[in-house]
Amino acid sequence: MEERLRNELSIEKAMIIPGDSDDTPWVKTEMGKACANCMKKLLKGENIIAVTGGSTLAAVAEMATPQIGDGLLFVPARGGFGEDVEHQANSICSKMAEKTGSKHRVLYVPDEISPEMYETFIKEQKINEVLQLIRSANMIIHGIGDALKMAERRKTSPEVMEFLKRE
């Protein structure tokens, strides 16, 4: 299944940890350990690591250790939303940097904005700098969550919620 996922996404490495993290909390801990071990093996020298949010990535951050590597820079792969700051990419980057003795950057923009607002935001030097770092990341740690739960947290419109339920 990992090979199929690698081929489908055209990526070098994919890892699947057995279990259902919704039913068995220790699965997220195991995912965190596996991710930390993978990072230790793959990261040599200076690296930019883009990180998404969510409870799984928060568990990964808890398993990070200084042995993962030197010269790491963690950047959020997305902005923030809602009030659950603990599971936002900015917070997870901060925790990973703290646990590994590395650096991190933040991206203080909402997840969902209009195209006009996006154009305004990217003109801001600090935001543009972080966006460039995200684009140059040589590793992305991306969680996969339940689309309906994420949409509810983001207070998605009823029309989009109906679409997600149908699909």
Regions found by a protein language model. Give the residues of each.
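Distinct, well-ordered alpha-helical segments
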Residues: 62-66
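Ligand-binding beta-strand-loop-alpha-helix segment within the catalytic cores
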Residues: 3-37, 41-45, 69-167
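Gly/Ser/Thr-rich loops at beta-strand to alpha-helix junctions
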Residues: 49-59, 82, 146-148
